[in-house]
Curated annotation (Swiss-Prot):
Lineage start: Eukaryota, Metazoa, Ecdysozoa, Arthropoda, Chelicerata
Species, as recorded: Ctenus ornatus
Keywords: Disulfide bond, Ion channel impairing toxin, Ionotropic glutamate receptor inhibitor, Knottin, Neurotoxin, Postsynaptic neurotoxin, Secreted, Toxin, Voltage-gated sodium channel impairing toxin
Family: Belongs to the neurotoxin 03 (Tx2) family. 05 subfamily.
Location of this chain's protein in the cell: Secreted
Protein name as it appears in the record: U1-ctenitoxin-Co1a
Length: 23
């Protein structure tokens, strides 16, 4: 899943230089 996707996973949001909100 990508950042901001309600049904997405937070794997792409945490770990790395990217900060974003996962729902």
């Amino acid at each position: 899943g990508k950042c901001g996707e309600i049904n997405g996973s937070c794997d792409e949001c945490y770990g790395g230089s990217v900060t974003c909100d996962c729902y």
